From Swiss-Prot:
The lineage of its organism: Eukaryota, Amoebozoa, Evosea, Eumycetozoa, Dictyostelia. This is Putative uncharacterized protein DDB_G0288767. It comes from the Eukaryota.
Length: 202
């Protein structure tokens, strides 16, 4: 068992609540070329189990009236494809971006699962050295699917600055949308096929 896999299992077994500190301790994928895609996906599967336990105990509320979400909404979140999209946003943030000066003014180049002209919750920005960085925006916006961290603070450290994003309690909006589901499946396929994606970010 290599060090990455061992580290992943230790995190899942010893951590009941995943937070930004735990995620930032995960070894960077670009610095560990011996970790292939299957190992990376194994960690994501372990992460699924942790998320399932965490979210099954959480009470979801609507922002408008603070009423609990119906069980159907929680069941939709438990769909593996939706969880995969949620996890990949976090894992991509850790594995595929670090170092390089981060330009706050740079235009968003691509967004996971959304239209670029929408007000977005999670956007892939490109840094000055052409690495990618995922930023979770503060605003709850007009979109169809918003898996987001709840009551969480993410601190992203770069060479030039520390950027702290406070993510307060927000809605978890899960709409059954065939087009959106297709986008999530495509995203999962892309990750599985990019066996050496870290090479582009060295």
């Amino acid at each position: 068992m290599n060090s990455f896999r061992s580290f992943s299992m230790q995190c899942v077994q010893s951590t009941t609540t995943w937070d930004s500190t735990t995620i930032r301790r995960i070894p960077y994928y670009r610095d560990e070329p011996e970790y292939d895609t299957e190992t990376k996906l194994e960690f994501i599967r372990l992460f699924f189990n942790s998320l399932t336990n965490q979210f099954s105990k959480r009470t979801f509320t609507r922002n408008e009236n603070k009423q609990p979400f119906e069980s159907e909404m929680v069941n939709q979140f438990n769909d593996s494809k939706l969880k995969l999209n949620y996890c990949l946003k976090l894992v991509r943030n850790n594995f595929l971006c670090e170092t390089g000066k981060f330009q706050l003014s740079i235009k968003a180049r691509k967004c996971i699962g959304y239209n670029e002209d929408s007000r977005l919750d999670a956007v892939i920005f490109q840094t000055s050295d052409f690495r990618r960085k995922v930023i979770f925006k503060e605003e709850v916006a007009n979109y169809e699917f918003t898996p987001s961290l709840v009551n969480e603070s993410i601190k992203i450290k770069n060479e030039c600055e520390d950027l702290t994003l406070l993510l307060n309690e927000r809605r978890l909006v899960l709409n059954q949308n065939p087009i959106l589901l297709s986008q999530l499946i495509d995203l999962a396929s892309i990750i599985k096929n990019e066996k050496h994606e870290y090479n582009a970010f060295k």
